[in-house]
From Swiss-Prot:
Function: S antigens are soluble heat-stable proteins present in the sera of some infected individuals.
Cellular component, GO, one term: symbiont-containing vacuole
Composition-biased stretches (Acidic residues): 60-79
Record bears the keyword Signal: yes
UniProt keyword Zinc present: no
InterPro entries noted in UniProt: S-antigen
Keywords, in A-Z order: Malaria, Repeat, Signal
Organism whose genome encodes this protein: Plasmodium falciparum (isolate Wellcome)
Subcellular location, principal: other
Signal peptide start-end: 1-23
Sequence repeat feature ranges: 90-97, 98-105, 106-113, 114-121, 122-129, 130-137, 138-145, 146-153, 154-161, 162-169, 170-177, 178-185, 186-193, 194-201, 202-209, 210-217, 218-225, 226-233, 234-241, 242-249, 250-257, 258-265, 266-273, 274-281, 282-289, 290-297, 298-305, 306-313, 314-321, 322-329, 330-337, 338-345, 346-353, 354-361, 362-369, 370-377, 378-385, 386-393, 394-401, 402-409, 410-417, 418-425, 426-433, 434-441, 442-449, 450-457, 458-465, 466-473, 474-481, 482-489, 490-497, 498-505, 506-513, 514-521, 522-529, 530-537, 538-545, 546-553, 554-561, 562-569, 570-577, 578-585, 586-593, 594-601, 602-609, 610-617
Start and end residues of each stretch annotated as 66 X 8 AA approximate tandem repeats of G-P-N-S-D-G-D-K: 90-617
Protein name (database record): S-antigen protein
Length: 640
């Protein structure tokens, strides 16, 4: 065995000597040239001599340089693939200036200024200023200023100022100032200042200053400073100092000594002996014989024969024949012929000809010509010229000059000088000293001692059984069957089947199937199937299936299946399956399977399996070494 090894070593070194002296070096690369001493001969003045093949060493030096250029050109591709490891600045890399890279200035990159990148200024990027990016200023991005982005200022973005974004100022965004966004100032957004948004200042939004919003300063919102909101200082709100509120000392509150309260001795309370109470003998109570009660024979009750009840024959009831009821023939009912009803011919109804209705010609209706309606010419309407409307010139409207509006000069508005407004000095406003305001001691506010608040025992409160309350069976309440309530079947309610409600099937609601709602199937809602909603299937929503939403299946949404969304399956979303999203399967997303994403399986992504990505299955240095060694062996055999 030792003899065999000795002979093998002898033959090997003999081969090296012969090859070094007489062998070919024309086809060898830079490494073989170093091994076999070509530079040694050149350094020692032997460049003018000829080798055994009749070639000058000077010619060999030129051939060697050509081989080095060839090897460098072949290695350049590998170097471009290994720039994520070496920190160079080629395109589609991590930390360079090329397009579709991570941490550079190219498009579709991560942390650079290109589009569709992560942390740069390009569009569709993550953390940059491009559109459809994450954390930048481009559209459809995450954390930037572009549209449809996440955390930026573009539209349809997340956390920026663009529309349909998340956390920005654009419309339909999440957390920004645009409309239909999440956390911004746009309309129909989440956490911003736009109307019908979540957490912003728009109307029918969540957490903003618009009316009928959640957590903002608009009226009928949740956690904001508008009236009829949850967690603000507006009327019919949760956690404020207004009347009919929850947690204050006003009348008709929950947990206080006022009338229509919960757990006190006043009338219209819950668990006491007063009228309109829950479990007592007063009127408007729950489980008693008084009027406006739940399960009793009084008027305005739930499941009894009184007026304004739910499932009884009284007026203003739900599913009975009384006025102002839901599904009966009374006035102010839902689906009956009475006034103020839903789908009947009475006033203040939904889809009828009465006033305060939805889709009829009465006042205070939705889509009719009456006052306090939605899309009509009456006051307190949405999209009409009446007062207290949305997008009209009436008072209490959104985007008009009437009182109680959003962005106008009327009272009860958002951003105007009228009373009951947001950011003005009038009563029922947000941030002023008037009643029904946010941060003041006026009535109809959230977190104060006035009536019509949330956290007290009065009507229009949260957690009681009075009318216009949250969590009771009265009208305009949250969690009951009355109109304009939360979780009931009335119009403009939260969690019911009425329009402009939260969690119901009406339009502009939260968690229902209506448009502009939160968590329902309507458009511009939060968590529903409507467009421009949050968590629903509509467009421009948050967490739903609509477009421009957050967490839904719509386009430009956050966490849904729509395009330009955050965490959904749509394009330009964050954490969903759409394109240009963050953490989803769409293209130009962050952490999803789409192209130009961060941490997904798409192309131009960061940390995914796609091409031009960071953390993908690219060729490493070990692969390059294997290629070089394989090439050396081939050249050695060629030289022999």
């Amino acid at each position: 065995m030792n003899r065999i090894l000795s002979v093998s070593f002898y033959l090997f070194f003999l081969y090296l000597y012969i090859y070094k002296t007489y062998g070919k070096v024309k086809n060898t690369d830079h490494e073989l040239s170093n091994i076999y001493g070509i530079k040694y001969y050149l350094r020692n003045g032997l460049s003018d001599k000829k080798n055994g093949k009749g070639q000058k060493y000077q010619d060999l030096e030129e051939d060697e340089n050509d081989d080095e250029e060839d090897s460098n050109s072949e290695e350049s591709n590998n170097d471009e693939e290994n720039k994520l490891i070496e920190g160079q600045e080629g395109p589609n890399s991590d930390g360079d200036k090329g397009p579709n890279s991570d941490g550079d200035k190219g498009p579709n990159s991560d942390g650079d200024k290109g589009p569709n990148s992560d942390g740069d200024k390009g569009p569709n990027s993550d953390g940059d200023k491009g559109p459809n990016s994450d954390g930048d200023k481009g559209p459809n991005s995450d954390g930037d200023k572009g549209p449809n982005s996440d955390g930026d200022k573009g539209p349809n973005s997340d956390g920026d100022k663009g529309p349909n974004s998340d956390g920005d100022k654009g419309p339909n965004s999440d957390g920004d100032k645009g409309p239909n966004s999440d956390g911004d100032k746009g309309p129909n957004s989440d956490g911003d200042k736009g109307p019908n948004s979540d957490g912003d200042k728009g109307p029918n939004s969540d957490g903003d200053k618009g009316p009928n919003s959640d957590g903002d300063k608009g009226p009928n919102s949740d956690g904001d400073k508008g009236p009829n909101s949850d967690g603000d200082k507006g009327p019919n709100s949760d956690g404020d100092k207004g009347p009919n509120s929850d947690g204050d000392k006003g009348p008709n509150s929950d947990g206080d000594k006022g009338p229509n309260s919960d757990g006190d001795k006043g009338p219209n309370s819950d668990g006491d002996k007063g009228p309109n109470s829950d479990g007592d003998k007063g009127p408007n109570s729950d489980g008693d014989k008084g009027p406006n009660s739940d399960g009793d024979k009084g008027p305005n009750s739930d499941g009894d024969k009184g007026p304004n009840s739910d499932g009884d024959k009284g007026p203003n009831s739900d599913g009975d024949k009384g006025p102002n009821s839901d599904g009966d023939k009374g006035p102010n009912s839902d689906g009956d012929k009475g006034p103020n009803s839903d789908g009947d011919k009475g006033p203040n109804s939904d889809g009828d000809k009465g006033p305060n209705s939805d889709g009829d010609k009465g006042p205070n209706s939705d889509g009719d010509k009456g006052p306090n309606s939605d899309g009509d010419k009456g006051p307190n309407s949405d999209g009409d010229k009446g007062p207290n409307s949305d997008g009209d010139k009436g008072p209490n409207s959104d985007g008009d000059k009437g009182p109680n509006s959003d962005g106008d000069k009327g009272p009860n508005s958002d951003g105007d000088k009228g009373p009951n407004s947001d950011g003005d000095k009038g009563p029922n406003s947000d941030g002023d000293k008037g009643p029904n305001s946010d941060g003041d001691k006026g009535p109809n506010s959230d977190g104060d001692k006035g009536p019509n608040s949330d956290g007290d025992k009065g009507p229009n409160s949260d957690g009681d059984k009075g009318p216009n309350s949250d969590g009771d069976k009265g009208p305009n309440s949250d969690g009951d069957k009355g109109p304009n309530s939360d979780g009931d079947k009335g119009p403009n309610s939260d969690g019911d089947k009425g329009p402009n409600s939260d969690g119901d099937k009406g339009p502009n609601s939260d968690g229902d199937k209506g448009p502009n709602s939160d968590g329902d199937k309507g458009p511009n809602s939060d968590g529903d199937k409507g467009p421009n909603s949050d968590g629903d299937k509509g467009p421009n929503s948050d967490g739903d299936k609509g477009p421009n939403s957050d967490g839904d299946k719509g386009p430009n949404s956050d966490g849904d299946k729509g395009p330009n969304s955050d965490g959904d399956k749509g394009p330009n979303s964050d954490g969903d399956k759409g394109p240009n999203s963050d953490g989803d399967k769409g293209p130009n997303s962050d952490g999803d399977k789409g192209p130009n994403s961060d941490g997904d399986k798409g192309p131009n992504s960061d940390g995914d399996k796609g091409p031009n990505s960071d953390g993908e299955h690219s060729r490493s240095k070990n692969d390059n070494k294997k290629k070089k060694s394989k090439k050396n062996i081939i050249n050695m055999f060629i030289g022999m």
